[in-house]
Design a protein with these regions (language model features):
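Small-residue (G/A/S/T)-rich helix-start motifs and N-terminal tracts that mark the onset
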Residues: 1-76
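Single conserved hydrophobic/aromatic residue that forms the stacking wall/gate
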Residues: 118-127
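Intrinsically disordered/low-complexity terminal segments and short unstructured peptides
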Residues: 36, 93, 122-123
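Conserved beta-alpha-beta core of the PfkB/ribokinase-like small-molecule kinase fold
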Residues: 79, 83-119
Length: 127
């Protein structure tokens, strides 16, 4: 069965599979679409909490996005955890350069398992 559409997911990886890029892939697939990804961070977490977050360098995130858009393309983009301002700027510039449409921004501000603030509102507004 041919997928209905292609969705680029830009988000962090949740080792427990309950959120982040893993949950987005499950959702996109369940809706009959094809998921591609750009990983922005890797987490060590479970249902009890987030123990560690490692940011993927913004240059790598940008390269993941361009590799997908140059070859596979996308009908929509879903953005989750970006984790730092360099990544936010890089994702914004890359999607703007490719004139990406149908962009859904679902930012992660606080992990539900713990009180972990990724970015403050003033930081986001400066981008």
């Amino acid at each position: 069965m041919k997928p209905k559409s292609k969705v680029l997911i830009i988000a962090g990886s949740d080792s427990s599979g309950g959120a982040g890029i893993q949950a987005d892939i499950k959702t996109v697939t369940a809706l009959g679409s094809y998921a591609t990804t750009a990983v922005t961070a890797v987490t060590a977490q479970n249902t009890k909490g987030v123990k560690k977050i490692i940011s993927i360098p913004s240059e790598i995130v940008q390269k993941q996005i361009t590799m997908i858009l140059d070859d596979i393309g996308t009908h929509a983009v879903k953005i989750g955890m970006l984790h730092n301002t360099d990544t936010i700027k890089s994702v914004y510039k890359t999607l703007k350069r490719y004139k990406s449409k149908n962009v859904v921004l679902d930012p992660v501000m606080i992990a539900k398992a713990v009180s972990y603030t990724h970015l403050t509102l003033p930081t986001i507004l400066l981008v």
